[in-house]
Amino acid sequence: MVTGIGMDIVEVLRVAKAVMQDNFVMRVFTPAETAYCRSKGKQAAQSFAARFAGKEAVLKAFGTGLRGGKLTEIEILNDNLGCPQVSLTGYFAAYARQKGVKNIWLSLTHTKEYAAAQRVMEAEK
């Protein structure tokens, strides 16, 4: 049963400027996300922006906003096929368990100028 849908779009340039500040990167991204995005070279800003949009989409699907948790408790990394996978820790992991969340489906996309994410949260009936 679908229990939440979230979607977000961000400007890559805006995120590119923000990730120039280490404080922003440490507050928003996990070390693994940061390493992944920086490994993308010229497309690093697009990768950061897509993950930022993904985190926002997760928050919207939960319907909670950032209350009680931190963005670093939502980690988005790709599996060996390149599909984005969401891992939750801390507050958001506990919230997902409480809501009976079984699957989190996430789609990320980006162009030179924009990054977007859509997320569907599925729980047991």
Describe the predicted segments one by one:
Residues 1-125:
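Core catalytic alpha/beta fold that binds nucleotide/phospho-ligands
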